[in-house]
Every structure is written in structure tokens, then in C-alpha cells.
């Protein structure tokens, strides 16, 4: 059940990865050299994004400039989109994702978003479907505030205590991560680098402090993005910590910080 649920989210990336890995086997020596080079390029591509971790005061993003392309209209200062999400699926249970996304508009210096709870289920016929509840929020003085009354005290507390990973994550040790599993497709273009972490890793310790992670397995860190590695930084940059991934169970945390054109321009 878990396998099919996650395939819904990652099938495109997985198919491309299989193709790339298959091609990489043609020449071990030459491809290892290329892989090492690509690993360095991927780290460099992520460097400016990861330098924003940590930004404890989210209102600092109102004064942060991001990468622009032709989609930005004249005079648009842009909007930062920040998202953090924890997903847990234990054996014979539904997949539950909880997280928040906010949009910080640099033109109006206002921030709105939503806290969400998504449950992915499988019916008696084997069909997988998603049930999602969203709770609109705003941010004032670096504090997340619900826009509507919430009867569920548990959800209300989760919103009050919520912190985005960009507020406490830290990647100052990125250069010490070595021998990553690298994939790269220049035609898409998409790329990724994956590293096995230890439970003593700072970011892993921080995640365990904030979430009930029902496994002692150390996670893998996956950096995946799109765009031209040789220059353009326009594209997405996603971070994922995968603790468990198999056909019966999935436990992973995802995070992203995007810079997009504003909808009010």
C-alpha cells in the first residue's frame, strides 16, 4: 500500500533516475569522475539556498532577494514560498502528512498560507485517494495565527508550535558530506545528490526534537533540484530526509524555499 501511495508523488523522478543509473554503468572509471564533478556542482547549486538556513525570523525574507527569470513583471519584488511537511506511514496504517506552506509577498509585506493535514487511504477495491484539510493562517510579528476559529485543540496547538525547517536547520557541514549517490539529466534538466546521515547529525537531532519519528534508523538526505547546473539557478530546490522507505512503511520529511512571481502583479 505504501509503495503505491508514494509512487503517486515520485514516479516521474524514479523513472528518470532508473534511466540515468542504467546509463551510468557503461563506464565505471569515467563516470565516477563525472559523478564526482556533478556532486560538487550540485552542492554549489544548492549553496545559496542552503545559506538561508537558519533564518529564525521569517520576516527577514521580506528583505531577501531571490533569483528572477522572464516570468517576473517589472516592479514585482517577488514572493517567497516556504513549505515544511512531515509524512508518516506505519505498517497497515494510512499515510498521514502534516505541514504548512506560507507565501511572503515582498510587495505588500504580508504573509498568508495554510496548515494542512493530508491522509492518503486505500479503499476496499485497492484504489488510493487523498483526504486533505486546510486551515488558513497569516503571519504577524513572526508568529503564525489562524485566520478562522479552530475547534480541534490538537490542530490549534500544532499550528501555534509550528516551526519551519528554514528557521532551525543548518547546512554548514554540507561540504563534509562525501560520496553521495548522484543523478543528473541535462535534458530535463533535473539532478539530485543523496547522503547517508547519522543520528548525531545536527539536522537529524533537530527533527527528532520536533517530531515524533517512530524509528531509530538514521535518515538519508536527498537534495534534488531543477535548472542549469552551469549557471542558471532558476528552478526548484527540494530537501528530503528519508528515515524509512519500503512497500509497507514510509517516514520522511520534506522542505522547500521557492522564490516566485507575485500574484498581485
Curated annotation (Swiss-Prot):
Q: Where is the lipid attached (S-diacylglycerol cysteine)?
A: 23
What membrane topology does the annotation report for this chain? Lipid-anchor
Write down any Gene Ontology CC term.
plasma membrane
Q: Which InterPro entries match?
A: Csa (IPR007595), Csa_sf (IPR038641)
Q: Name one Pfam family in it.
A: DUF576
- PROSITE patterns the UniProt entry points to: PROKAR_LIPOPROTEIN (PS51257)
**Keywords in UniProt for this one?**
Cell membrane, Lipoprotein, Membrane, Palmitate, Signal
Q: Where is the lipid attached (N-palmitoyl cysteine)?
A: 23
Subcellular location as annotated: Cell membrane
Signal peptide coordinates: 1-22
Recorded family membership: Belongs to the staphylococcal tandem lipoprotein family.
What is the name of the protein in this document?
Answer: Uncharacterized lipoprotein SAR0402
Amino acid at each position: 500500500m505504501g509503495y503505491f501511495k508514494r509512487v503517486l508523488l515520485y514516479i516521474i523522478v524514479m523513472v528518470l533516475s532508473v534511466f540515468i543509473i542504467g546509463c551510468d554503468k557503461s563506464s565505471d572509471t569515467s563516470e565516477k569522475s563525472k559523478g564526482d564533478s556533478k556532486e560538487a556542482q550540485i552542492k554549489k547549486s544548492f549553496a545559496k539556498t542552503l545559506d538561508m538556513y537558519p533564518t529564525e525570523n521569517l520576516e527577514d525574507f521580506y528583505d531577501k532577494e531571490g533569483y528572477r527569470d522572464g516570468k517576473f513583471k517589472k516592479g514585482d519584488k517577488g514572493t517567497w514560498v516556504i513549505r515544511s511537511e512531515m509524512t508518516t506511514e506505519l505498517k497497515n496504517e494510512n499515510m498521514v502528512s502534516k505541514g504548512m506552506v506560507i507565501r511572503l509577498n515582498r510587495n505588500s509585506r504580508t504573509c498568508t498560507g495554510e496548515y494542512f493535514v493530508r491522509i492518503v487511504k486505500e479503499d476496499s477495491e485497492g484504489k488510493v485517494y487523498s483526504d486533505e484539510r486546510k486551515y488558513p493562517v497569516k503571519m504577524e510579528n513572526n508568529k503564525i495565527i489562524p485566520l478562522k476559529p479552530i475547534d480541534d485543540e490538537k490542530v490549534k496547538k500544532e499550528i501555534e508550535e509550528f516551526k519551519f525547517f528554514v528557521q532551525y536547520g543548518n547546512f554548514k557541514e554540507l561540504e563534509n558530506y562525501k560520496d553521495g549517490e548522484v543523478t543528473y539529466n541535462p535534458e530535463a534538466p533535473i539532478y539530485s545528490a543523496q547522503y547517508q546521515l547519522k543520528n548525531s547529525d545536527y539536522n537529524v537531532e533537530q527533527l527528532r526534537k520536533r517530531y515524533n519519528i517512530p524509528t531509530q534508523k538514521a535518515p538519508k538526505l536527498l537534495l534534488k533540484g531543477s535548472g542549469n547546473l552551469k549557471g542558471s539557478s532558476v528552478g526548484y530546490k527540494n530537501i528530503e530526509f528519508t528515515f524509512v522507505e519500503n512497500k509497507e512503511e514510509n517516514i520522511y520529511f520534506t522542505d522547500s524555499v521557492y522564490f516566485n512571481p507575485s500574484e498581485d502583479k
